[in-house]
């Protein structure tokens, strides 16, 4: 009976760690997206077009190599 209780506690701890790691990942992704959209908002439309054009050229050149 004691072994079952210990096993259940270990399982609960593993589940807790897994849930906490998922929460941390979601929070980090959310903060990253907020930072990206904030930077895009500050750059403006003309800067975004230039960045998109440069990025497109970089991707095309990388694929051709």
UniProtKB/Swiss-Prot annotation:
Principal localisation: membrane
Keywords in alphabetical order: Cell inner membrane, Cell membrane, Membrane, Signal-anchor, Stress response, Transmembrane, Transmembrane helix
Induction notes from the record: By acid stress, via the EvgS/EvgA system.
Membrane side Periplasmic: residue ranges: 40-65
Cellular component, GO annotation: plasma membrane
Ranges annotated as spanning the membrane: 19-39
Keyword Cell inner membrane applies: yes
Membrane topology summary: Single-pass type II membrane protein
Organism domain of life: Bacteria
Protein purpose: Connects the signal transduction between the two-component systems EvgS/EvgA and PhoQ/PhoP, by directly interacting with PhoQ and thus activating the PhoQ/PhoP system, in response to acid stress conditions.
Protein family according to the UniProt entry: Belongs to the SafA family.
Protein name listed in UniProt: Two-component-system connector protein SafA
Lineage of producing organism: Bacteria, Pseudomonadati, Pseudomonadota, Gammaproteobacteria, Enterobacterales
Gene: safA
């Amino acid at each position: 009976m004691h072994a079952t209780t210990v096993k259940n506690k270990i399982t609960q701890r593993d589940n807790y760690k897994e849930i906490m790691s998922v929460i941390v990942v979601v929070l980090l992704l959310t903060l990253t997206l907020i930072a990206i959209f904030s930077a895009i908002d500050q750059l403006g439309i003309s800067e975004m077009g230039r960045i998109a054009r440069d990025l497109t050229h970089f991707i095309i050149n990388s694929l051709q190599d």
